[in-house]
A protein has these predicted regions:
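Bacterial N-terminal signal peptides
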Residues: 3-13
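Extracytoplasmic copper-binding redox domains, predominantly the cupredoxin/blue-copper superfamily
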Residues: 17-221
Length: 221
């Protein structure tokens, strides 16, 4: 939830316009099985023995992120990411080009975030409650990992006109809040790819409900 200061900044940025919500969902192109039964058995054995943290159930959409892009001068809305349940939540993250994104450690154990191919980023351990700030230049996407726990993976997208982020539930639903009225591009990111896009216009005074988006193979951003 935005604080009073951030909300005021949004209103100033859009000339006193109200802030609205967008509701939608994704469908199709479910995640493929990530590992064999034998590797799963090995993973759960290590969890039981305390060698690995227990990873949350990813379902079909833990690697999916909904974002809005467009003309917007305020800070990105709802773009909060972190480690939770032994992995990145969500595993696909986005940040505005030329800024930094914070990855909070919400687990009770230490993580060591790595970003493959990102110049100037040094993996360092982050204890419970700590956060790492990642500088995000133009380019990417970049692969994310954890030098302590090899099962952790993810991707970081750099987006020049990022406005807002929304996580996608296991049932495929997402919701943006506190979005100023106006035209935007609604984009669905999954791993290193953009798998759906649609132009939307947020009206003043009511929630915009978007028809389901079909996730497809990679599309250029």
């Amino acid at each position: 939830m935005l604080g009073a200061g951030c909300a005021a900044a949004l209103l100033v940025a859009f000339g006193g316009a109200s802030a609205e919500s967008i509701e939608g969902s994704v469908q199709g192109n479910k995640s493929e099985q990530a590992s064999s039964d034998s590797s799963k058995q090995d993973y759960y054995w290590k969890v039981w023995n305390g060698a690995l943290p227990e990873q949350r159930d990813k379902g079909d959409h833990a690697d999916v992120l909904a974002v809005l892009t467009g003309k917007f001068t305020g800070p990105p809305i709802g773009c909060k990411f972190g480690f939770r349940g032994g992995g990145l939540a969500p595993s696909t993250i986005a940040a505005r080009s030329g800024t930094t994104v914070r990855i909070e450690n919400r687990d009770a154990f230490t993580h060591e975030l790595s970003v493959s191919g990102l110049p100037g980023f040094t993996p360092l351990e982050s204890g419970p409650g700590k956060a790492r700030a990642i500088p995000v230049p133009a380019g990417g996407p970049w692969e994310l990992g954890d030098r302590i726990y090899g099962h952790v993976d993810g991707h970081l997208h750099s987006m020049r006109e990022l406005v807002a982020c929304a996580t996608v539930t296991a049932s495929g639903k997402f919701r943006f809040d506190n979005v100023p009225p106006g035209p935007y591009s609604l984009r669905i990111l999954r791993g290193p790819e953009q798998v759906a896009t649609r132009r939307v216009t947020v009206p003043a005074g009511k929630t915009l409900k978007v028809d389901p988006l079909n996730m497809s193979k990679s599309r250029r951003r």
